[in-house]
């Protein structure tokens, strides 16, 4: 404990015998032992109290972490987050119910106030007049105008070099092609197809 060797203890014992004397040395050693025992007991009590305080602090920390974990329950946080949404949904439902009840009250009309005429179930004696179709002259005029527009030749870009002369001569010779008039196609009569022969039919 004090890093005292045997030789040093022997020197201390010799000094105590010389100073205190052989007669008073045993009661003094007993008092010193009791004092050491008391000091150890106080140190043990202090250590026990200190250890108990540490355990309580650790338990408090554990209790605190458990309570934090319970407070951090995701279900509770989701409930708190959904609560405003639930309130908004209830408000919207209430508004919709008010709107539907108001419109139902406004649309209710007493049956005596509105009398719908009953339609007759018989056919009229004279057929209704149908407007005669307009003459087809404007359509023909539109076709003639379309032919004159189509008859205009497109401007041809002049190529460079010797080929340009050949292309110019060919373009001058080309005659603008008139668009053929639209005619209705004649339908061919439907012919019956012969069923295809299979190998089983041949056999």
From Swiss-Prot:
Pfam families: TatA_B_E. GO terms for biological process: protein transport by the Tat complex. It is found in: Cell inner membrane. It is a single-pass membrane protein. The chain crosses the membrane at residues 1-21. Its main location: membrane. One of its GO terms (cellular component) is TAT protein transport complex. Keywords: Cell inner membrane, Cell membrane, Membrane, Protein transport, Translocation, Transmembrane, Transmembrane helix, Transport. InterPro entries: TatA/B/E, TatB. Residues 179-203 are annotated as: Disordered. GO terms for molecular function: protein transmembrane transporter activity. It comes from the Bacteria. The Tat system comprises two distinct complexes: a TatABC complex, containing multiple copies of TatA, TatB and TatC subunits, and a separate TatA complex, containing only TatA subunits. Substrates initially bind to the TatABC complex, which probably triggers association of the separate TatA complex to form the active translocon. Belongs to the TatB family. Part of the twin-arginine translocation (Tat) system that transports large folded proteins containing a characteristic twin-arginine motif in their signal peptide across membranes. Together with TatC, TatB is part of a receptor directly interacting with Tat signal peptides. TatB may form an oligomeric binding site that transiently accommodates folded Tat precursor proteins before their translocation. This is Sec-independent protein translocase protein TatB. It comes from Rhizobium johnstonii (strain DSM 114642 / LMG 32736 / 3841).
